[in-house]
């Protein structure tokens, strides 16, 4: 679950 949350944050940063 932690990995998924971190991935979402990374995607938002790139966007």
Swiss-Prot record:
Glycosylated. It comes from the Eukaryota. Keywords: Antibiotic, Antimicrobial, Glycoprotein, Protease inhibitor, Thiol protease inhibitor. Disulfide bonds: none annotated. GO terms for molecular function: cysteine-type endopeptidase inhibitor activity. GO terms for biological process: defense response to Gram-negative bacterium; defense response to Gram-positive bacterium. Stable in the pH range 4.0-9.0 at 37 degrees Celsius. Stable when incubated in the temperature range 25-75 degrees Celsius and pH 7.5. Belongs to the cystatin family. Inhibits papain, ficin and bromelain with an IC(50) of 0.079 uM, 0.099 uM and 0.125 uM respectively. Has antibacterial activity against Gram-positive bacteria S.aureus and S.hemolyticus, and against the Gram-negative bacterium E.coli. Reduced antibacterial activity against Gram-positive bacterium B.subtilis. No antibacterial activity against the Gram-negative bacterium P.fluorescens. This is Cystatin-2. It comes from Capra hircus (Goat). The lineage of its organism: Eukaryota, Metazoa, Chordata, Craniata, Vertebrata.
């Amino acid at each position: 679950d932690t990995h998924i949350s971190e991935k979402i944050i990374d995607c938002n940063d790139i966007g």
